Swiss-Prot record:
Belongs to the UPF0102 family. It comes from the Bacteria. It holds the Pfam family UPF0102. This is UPF0102 protein Gmet_2864. One of its GO terms (molecular function) is nucleic acid binding.
Amino acid sequence: MSLHNKSLGSKGESLAVTYLERHRYKILERNFRCRGGEIDIVARDGKTIVFVEVKTRTSGHYGPPQLAVTSFKQRQISKAALTWLAKQRQLDACARFDVISITFSGQMPQIEHIPNAFELAY
């Protein structure tokens, strides 16, 4: 991954955190990594644990950012989510998978939040 892509991704994740906090989510962890995968943001929405994948683009040339959350990526996120829940001893917690899509194509970034974007994937 190029330095530009890492910088863009980091900027997108920071913007997503700000967005979630403004919508009264509590951020529990950022960039959780384990053997099975990675989760950009772990948050709490009321009593629900929310695993958030952030996809950031500079244009819609390759389609909307959320299309980059492939079935393979969903399986990786799911494995990481199960690991996170086990480490927190919260395997019985209500949880969901959201995607936040950010496009920087003009003055103001466009943010789309997709709650329940996908189900737990094996």
